[in-house]
């Protein structure tokens, strides 16, 4: 298995007139590769995976894999709050040739820690494919605790975790209970890349990399190489732009930002609505101040 590390983009899913725009997706993926991105993660939260049909998800993942052609990691979004559906999604990712699958904790039905353990264990037993668990309690109302992560790692059921709690004490606990390099630790928060890496993280699955991939790659490289001053300067420079990516619900602002770069339309799928004019102005101003060239 390839090492799951570096600067990865939670890539948006371009849409046009209500349909997935695969041509624009290919162009975005090629641009990411040219900018040095280490991995592409299609069909995640930012990629609106939950509102894609099964056929659309397959098309998106296949398009990314065919475009990348082994030049970067592909970690396919494959989560569900039904274990049997998650298993089928992971099987699809495996069949299509992804490097791993990103599997969010089951949402809405609020399983216990034992339920979470059995969920990921069942996926591993049915697929024998590398899974990155995705812990984002702010969206799922479920928190995958370090003790459970340690059980899963010991059982070989997960290859990594995308941790989106923005809690550095949590990352310290994970390293303590699971082991420094036992699994891949990937930040799910662009705001905390530097401290996350300093606490044992191996990289990030990033939203802002959709519009500033080279800047995010440089931040990750600086943080991982121990260039504290350089990494701190890069993290601080991104702060406002990071905040504006969440001025409304993700991926609304980042899709609007991608459109402002002229790289695809900013169309969203319901129930997500376009960002307001006021929010769009904030996003545009932050992009200009960061030095991005608008279309």
Swiss-Prot record:
Pathway in which this enzyme or protein is active: Amino-acid biosynthesis; L-lysine biosynthesis via DAP pathway; (S)-tetrahydrodipicolinate from L-aspartate: step 3/4
EC number from the UniProt entry: 4.3.3.7
Binding site for pyruvate: 46, 205
Listed GO CC annotations: cytosol
GO MF annotation: an example: 4-hydroxy-tetrahydrodipicolinate synthase activity
Subcellular location as annotated: Cytoplasm
Site (Part of a proton relay during catalysis): 45, 108
Annotated TM spans: none
SMART domains, A to Z: DHDPS
Keyword annotations: Amino-acid biosynthesis, Cytoplasm, Diaminopimelate biosynthesis, Lyase, Lysine biosynthesis, Schiff base
Biological process according to GO: diaminopimelate biosynthetic process; lysine biosynthetic process via diaminopimelate
Tree of life domain: Bacteria
Catalytic activity: L-aspartate 4-semialdehyde + pyruvate = (2S,4S)-4-hydroxy-2,3,4,5-tetrahydrodipicolinate + H2O + H(+)
Classification via InterPro entries: Aldolase_TIM, DapA, DapA-like, Schiff_base-form_aldolases_AS, Schiff_base-form_aldolases_CS
Catalytic site positions: 134 (proton donor/acceptor), 162 (schiff-base intermediate with substrate)
Complex formation: Homotetramer; dimer of dimers.
PANTHER family with a match to the protein in the record: 4-HYDROXY-2-OXOGLUTARATE ALDOLASE, MITOCHONDRIAL, DIHYDRODIPICOLINATE SYNTHASE
The family this protein is said to belong to: Belongs to the DapA family.
Functional description taken from the UniProt entry: Catalyzes the condensation of (S)-aspartate-beta-semialdehyde [(S)-ASA] and pyruvate to 4-hydroxy-tetrahydrodipicolinate (HTPA).
Protein name, entry field: 4-hydroxy-tetrahydrodipicolinate synthase
